[in-house]
Amino acid sequence: MTTDPKMLELLVCPITGGNLSFNRKTQELISLKAKLAYPIRDGVPIMLASEARPL
């Protein structure tokens, strides 16, 4: 996934509604408030709490 700043502005954590950051190394979207990492599969962010891993 490319880290388009506009895309990151639009995406929010589905649990907290807070901002997300992109972890280039793990290819995940990180919610610091929820302490969760959302996976990106085939370039598509999976924004389901059930698919997120705890930080």
Swiss-Prot record:
Similarity comment: family membership: Belongs to the UPF0434 family.
One GO cellular component assignment for this chain's record is: cytosol
- Specify the protein name: UPF0434 protein BARBAKC583_1098
Q: Which InterPro entries match?
A: Trm112-like
Pfam hit, one = Trm112p
Q: Which organism is it from?
A: Bartonella bacilliformis (strain ATCC 35685 / KC583 / Herrer 020/F12,63)
